[in-house]
Amino acid sequence: MVKLRLKRYGKKRQPSYRIIAIESKSRREARPLEELGYYNPRTKETVLQTAGLLKWLRCGAQPTETVDSLLKKAGIYEMLKAGEGGVVASIRIPAMAKPEAGIPEAAEEAPATESVAEAEVADVPESELSEAATETAAAELSPPEAEVEKPQVEEAVEA
């Protein structure tokens, strides 16, 4: 039976783990069938290769409790139920960092300018936007009438 479990690496008292697919009877440090991501418990950073995880879960691999909780947080089981076949190559779950005093102020200012521009565009109905776009496109494509000289055609009338 194939298990999805953690393989420890890193310095003493600074563990990091690789998420691997391995035979259940193999020891922890044995050569894995496939490496499927990593997990750092100190920074809570996790990177998962969804295509590989979905493949092994479909084949019947059993995750350990820790790997199971990581897969739930990343939404792998929802992808498996929905039938997505590795649409996303990998998922990065960033660490939960505590915001500093100066960072939230800058973060609040930046979205405010973006929302003003979005509000201006949102106020104009979609039909007016499309009409205005076609008028400007037509004006750009056709030269002004003053510059274009139309040849006058004289029709000869035979008597």
UniProtKB/Swiss-Prot annotation:
Ranges of compositional bias, category Low complexity: 102-119, 130-145
PROSITE patterns linked: RIBOSOMAL_S16
Keywords: Ribonucleoprotein, Ribosomal protein
Biased composition (Acidic residues): 120-129
GO molecular function: structural constituent of ribosome
UniProt-annotated stretches for the region Disordered: 102-159
GO biological process, one term: translation
Keyword Glycosyltransferase: no
The organism's place on the tree of life at top rank: Bacteria
Classification via InterPro entries: Ribosomal_bS16 (IPR000307), Ribosomal_bS16_CS (IPR020592), Ribosomal_bS16_dom_sf (IPR023803)
HAMAP family per UniProt: Ribosomal_bS16
Record-stated family: Belongs to the bacterial ribosomal protein bS16 family.
Official protein name in the record: Small ribosomal subunit protein bS16
Organism whose genome encodes this protein: Synechococcus sp. (strain JA-2-3B'a(2-13))
Upper classification of the organism: Bacteria, Bacillati, Cyanobacteriota, Cyanophyceae, Synechococcales
Gene this protein is translated from: rpsP
